[in-house]
A protein has these predicted regions:
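PP2C/PPM-type serine/threonine phosphatase catalytic domain
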Residues: 1-109
Length: 109
């Protein structure tokens, strides 16, 4: 399977989006790869207007990249960690990101 991903900041000063493809996190540019077997793709879109959207998106993708098949409890745990991180620094107050993703296990598909 061929995988293509593109993300760029556009007119904004910073790109708050992150794309996770297996263990690669893309923050700007074009990515192309081929994959046979397990596939994990996640898109974290930092919430504009909130503080530290890019930090939130990176944090979520970094935490997801080492989990083979992501489950509900993994997402709950990462959300709790993100909420805790938002209290560490006044610049992180209210940081948020959205998350969409898919995991494919070739042996089960």
């Amino acid at each position: 399977m061929k995988i293509y991903a593109i993300t760029k900041k556009g007119e904004h000063s910073e790109n708050e989006d992150r794309i996770l493809i297996n263990d690669t996190i893309l923050s700007d540019g074009i990515f192309e790869t081929e994959c046979n077997g397990e596939l994990k793709i996640c898109i974290a879109d930092g919430v504009g207007g909130n503080n530290a959207g890019a930090t939130a998106s990176s944090f979520v993708c970094e935490n997801l990249k080492n989990i083979a098949l992501i489950g509900k409890n993994d997402l709950i745990d990462i959300n709790s960690k993100l909420l805790a991180k938002s209290t560490e620094n006044v610049n992180y107050n209210g940081m948020a990101t959205t998350l969409s993703g898919i995991c494919i296990d070739d042996e089960k598909s």
